[in-house]
Amino acid sequence: GLLRTLSAMGQAHTPGYETAPAGANAKEEHLDFFHCPIKIISLNKGRSAVAASAYLSATQMENTWDGTTHDYTRKRHVVYAEVMLPEHAPPEYADRNVLWNSVDWSETKRDAQLARTVELAFPAELTHEQNIALIRRFVQETFVDKGMCADVAFHDKGDGNPHVHIMLTMRALQEDGRWASKSR
């Protein structure tokens, strides 16, 4: 499923990545993804989408719901961060603070599910540029093209464990810019 798709995309479409010749070490013949937890950020666990995004992107954001400022700017291992949006998304959603505050405000149930996070480990053998190209293509084709907003943060502490956090809206955006029913 998901990991096989990523592996195939890495071989076929990552600039500078060449498939090893037949008989080469199996580790060189394909990309291995060792880790892929998927989690839900929900209000009943006392979490907010704004706080989670600030943490993952190592930024400072204000939650307009309760006035809390979340400052994670001292984190130094975020190599790349980007908000990826469907074409019809309101342009202001390119600002992660606006996007996730909109999500927090749109969910009114006390046990509301706010966002989904996907974490993927990447091969240390690829360069940051190759990993970012792979991440962007995967997120675009798998989520954004289906109307989801994605907040992407690529982390590398230099410990041989480069990985990406993909934070997704639970609802797709409709063509008119309004939130659709939840995607489960």
Model-flagged regions — what are they?
Residues 1-184:
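N-terminal nicking endonuclease/strand-transfer module with a His-rich metal-binding environment
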